[in-house]
Amino acid sequence: IRSDVNFWIQTKRADSIQQRLPVDWNYGWENVTLCVTTENQRRADERLPILLDIPAKHKAFMIAPILSEAHVEKYLATNQFEQVLCDGENYDGDRPCYYEWIKSLHDQCKEYDVTFNFTGTGNVFVKDKKTYHIPKAYQRVQAQRSGLSYPS
């Protein structure tokens, strides 16, 4: 593997990671981050423990599209995750992303000093009981303007 390139390996199939790692993986490589995607609490509780059991120098997880509030404190407390990313549903989806869910993740990551990136609002964003329909071109910009990434 090229040591001059950083690789980000992302999957929702956490249970297949271990068997697909190279034979010389050992405790991971300095330039490879393993990332598992989840959508909600159920999937986080299903997939994150699997990633925790896999040796890797760098780990992250993404909640996208976020479909419900997620409490991930017990995973952050392991000190194995360097980054959490979150995004609302986009493309043809219309399931809402709630500001309160994002704020909760932000606060959890801040408490454990884990980088949090709110990468996009999704098509439907709800804040203060008001629903916003946000065109794809503005979803990332609106997420950045929210001030909910950590550190900001």
Describe every region a protein language model picked out.
Residues 67, 73-152:
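Auxiliary Fe-S-binding modules of radical SAM enzymes
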Residues 1-20, 24-70, 81-97:
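Core AdoMet radical
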